[in-house]
Design a protein with these regions (language model features):
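Divalent metal-coordination and catalytic microenvironments
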Residues: 9, 24, 29, 49, ...
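N-terminal metal-binding scaffold of metallo-dependent hydrolase/deaminase domains
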Residues: 1-39
Length: 424
């Protein structure tokens, strides 16, 4: 038996509407309670001046294993997650082979158990091999531990396939995660279609490519009663549609990334591949709409969309380099810089979008400091300044758009199942 007392921190738990200075007591791998009166423990952590919250959860992470271990492994990716303050991640099925059957899902869980850094919840494929033609073995994947279904960066373009997927996954109480882009409108596109795409002579991706797919998916969610989760929003039009869908009580949730909040399409002026992402960086008008969506609850979650690539892949020309950036180790400080320091969100609202909201979408018993729940805790130092240096990342990927940024705040201590697994 082991006990831990986290003393004197600002405890922020949106699941219980708690935001106050206090003590958190852990017994073995469970939370005993807040302000239990305990003053001694086997381990005491002084959290004065820090924020103590449920372990952060990232529901959009690509770990690359099996198949692309040169880009990332489960071990390096989960180590990066811990360094970023995450105690749980949901991993995309975009591996080789694709996680479209029970054996593949069980392999991912086995490898994650061996790595032993943080909790990993596998997402299964919607269609076999992500080809959009035939549904994957949904029932078998649920038995193999899949908490949701997605074809990752491959949008489910066929409306009939998506309809059947929503109907089927509803039976198992699982969400469908879709990348809301119309493939015909995004093919060979490099950046947001607008002033800078014309100035730079680069093929653009119109905002309408996202807006059209969001509208279709909302309509299918209404038709089927299924749960659609719309990944990595980037446009004002998508936010408007989701706001209306939520007002109607539809089962629609959504997410946004820190890089879509912090950067605009103007960043591509130097043809730097670490600003090439999918969906593309857009204009300030779209960013303002995304932030308002976070403020009013239209957007439920902030996720990293962690997309690690070996350095040589990102050294290609802009048109041939893969789209995507790493984000596990920069998510928290960029959120602090763009949302907390600017006054757009309170700490409680930000932490909700990183804890209880993703846990609720995934249907996992995480994201809370309630007594009896798993002792997954993130202790945040909100004030320490540091410079983002990709050479120090735990991730094998160095492809960040934030290299050299001066930021404040980072994960100070990360506890998984009652054990300290990371300490800055």
């Amino acid at each position: 038996m082991s006990t831990t007392l986290i003393r004197g921190g600002r405890i922020v738990d949106p699941s219980q509407n708690i935001d106050r200075v206090g003590n958190l007591f852990l017994r073995n791998d469970r939370i005993e309670g807040i302000d239990t009166g305990a003053t001694v423990a086997d381990h005491v952590i002084d959290a004065a001046g820090m924020i103590v919250c449920p372990g952060l959860i990232d529901l959009h992470v690509s770990l690359r294993e099996p198949g692309d271990e040169k880009d990332e492994t489960i071990e390096s990716g989960t180590a990066a997650a811990l360094a970023g303050g995450m105690t749980s991640v949901a991993c995309m099925p975009d591996t080789s082979p694709v996680v479209d059957n029970r054996a593949a899902a069980e392999f991912v869980q086995l490898q994650c158990a061996r790595a032993g850094y943080c909790n990993v919840f596998p997402l299964g494929a919607v269609t076999k091999n992500h080809d959009g033609q035939e549904l994957a073995e949904i029932g078998q994947l649920v038995e193999g531990g899949a908490v949701g279904f997605t074809d990752a960066k491959s949008p489910v373009a066929n409306a009939e396939i998506m309809r059947r997927a929503l109907e089927y996954t509803r039976m198992f109480g699982r969400p469908i995660f879709n990348h809301p882009q119309v493939p015909e409108l995004t093919a060979k596109g490099i950046m947001h279609e607008g002033y800078y795409s014309m100035l730079l002579g680069l093929r653009g991706i119109p905002a309408g490519a996202e807006v059209i797919m969001v509208a279709r998916d909302i309509a299918l969610a209404e038709m089927t009663g299924g749960h659609i989760h719309l990944m990595t929003l980037s446009t004002a039009g998508a936010v408007d549609q989701i706001r209306r869908a939520k007002a109607k009580g539809l089962r629609v949730t959504s997410e946004v990334t820190p890089h879509h909040l912090a950067l605009t399409d103007a960043a591509l002026q130097n043809y730097e591949t670490n600003f090439k992402v999918d969906p593309p960086l857009r204009t300030k008008e779209h960013i303002d709409a995304l932030i308002e969506g976070l403020r009013d609850g239209t957007i439920d979650v902030i996720s990293s969309d962690h997309q690690p690539f070996a350095e040589e892949k990102k050294q290609n020309e802009l048109d041939s380099a893969p789209a995507g950036v790493v984000g596990l180790e920069t998510l928290l400080p960029i959120c602090i810089k763009t949302l907390i320091e600017t006054g757009h969100l309170t700490w409680s609202k930000l932490i909700a979008k990183l804890t209880i909201n993703p846990a609720t979408i995934l249907g996992i018993q995480k994201g809370t400091l309630k007594s009896g729940h798993d002792a997954d805790i993130t202790i945040i130092d909100p004030v320490t300044s540091w410079r983002i240096d990709p050479s120090k990342f735990k991730s094998k990927g160095r492809n960040t758009p934030f290299a050299g940024w001066e930021v404040k705040g980072r994960a100070h201590t990360v506890i998984v199942a009652g054990r300290v697994r990371h300490h800055a």
